[in-house]
Amino acid sequence: MLKTLMALAVLTTPVSAATPQPALQWSSCPVADAPELQCADLPVALSPKSDRKITLKVARLPATGAKKGSVLVNFGGPQGYQIASLGSRTKIFDRIRTSMDVVTWDPRGYPGLSGAALQCDWGFVRTPAFPADQAGFDRLAAANKARGDKCRTTDPELFDHMDAASDARDADAVREALGEDKMNFLGLSYGGTIAQSYARLFPQRVRTMYVDGTGNHSPRDWGRELGSIARDNERLMGRFLAWAPAGTEKRWRALIAKADREPIPAPKAEARYDGTQLRSLAFLKLRPGPTRWGDLVAAITAAEAGDASAFALSSRQPYPGLPGGGVKECLDFPRPATQRDVARTVKRLRAIAPNLGAAFPLAWHLPLTCAGWPTRATNPPAPMPRTLPPLLGAGTWQDYASTRRVVEQIPGSRMIEHDGPGHNLFGAMANPCVIDHVSRYVTERRLPPRGTTCP
């Protein structure tokens, strides 16, 4: 009888949860020109298997009406200063705030208001040239490892837990501290990678999820996704070529072929560009749209005459590259193990997209700056559960297709298309039409009709 009662007790007693998050103690934020913003400190676990705690700074814009919930936002980056971003973008949340608090946090490891920041070089990292042989690849991997080790020595345990999945766990700790059973999540740009990671780890906690101008971190086949991105970029190049004078495509192909044989000088930038670098710099000049495309035509003309200086984005940083050092990205995306891996990818993508090829960050910059990284990729791309509630996404010429590949995985989801250039419609562009649809979706769980467009 005693054994029976004990067994029943085990079956009927709730499994004890992890230690509850403490209630947040809100006070003023150390952010200029954001008097409505309130901040609080939140201790979170460094990792699921660690007893160590780190402190996150959390911020909110309080609801202006009767509060019915909270919405968590990450503006992208993927670096810090999310709280400053919220403080400078309060107006886009006016409708959401009629019934919800808007909450963000400065992410772990980065400069900002949260504790436990890594002491790293967060500046510009030049994209390496594709290595010609295995010896060149090995030298590149060794240099990357040395750069990563220099950062890692400041806090090895934190460095090893900087992936978007760790951010997603931090987001769920914020949800719990807010006392919310389910969360509304806005993931903008790289914030969409964090949102997808959250959806994989905590699908039962998602009430609504909006992704804007994000990459697809949820494919079943990463190689196939790289091919899709190459096609997306080639379509953008196609818009430019249709706009440009007749014969521009033929001239462009001849120019990059010439640069692949012998780099073209850019004396005003004190640089020389090979074909891949020209492809990458041209892609960056495509993104602003037709108002700046004349500059690209002029750059092509000057380079044909032997001076590629007009391709430089600035004299200080004339070569392609990205800021941030890869501390998060190297843990979130696959990396090559050999020079042969790199060569195969380049050959395949150039066949898919002859005008731009592999000259985009996820095929060039990240693989070549993450090869040899001292921490393995702990949060590689993987599909999201199809049991999630319908998502909402939005995108421009540059990123509509990749965002669509995220949301179309979940039945009933919707997309908003902006037929124009730009990036991050809700946050950076503050598109009124998009803001209206997102606000309605988050507060009422009402999705726009299929085929919705915003000017």
What are these regions (language model features)?
Residues 248-391, 430:
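Alpha/beta-hydrolase fold active-site neighborhood
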Residues 120-129, 199-250, 301-306:
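A catalytic-pocket lid/entrance helix-loop region that shapes and gates access to the active site
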Residues 2-6, 11-138, 252-255, 375-378, ...:
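Catalytic-loop region of hydrolases
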Residues 421-432:
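Catalytic histidine-centered segment of alpha/beta-hydrolase-like enzymes
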Residues 180-190:
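Alpha/beta-hydrolase fold nucleophile elbow
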Residues 194-198, 402:
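Hydrolases whose catalytic domains are alpha/beta-hydrolase-1, hotdog thioesterase
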Residues 189-194, 202:
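Active-site loop->helix "elbow" adjoining a glycine-rich segment at hydrolase catalytic centers
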Residues 153-157, 168-182:
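Conserved acidic catalytic loop of the alpha/beta-hydrolase fold
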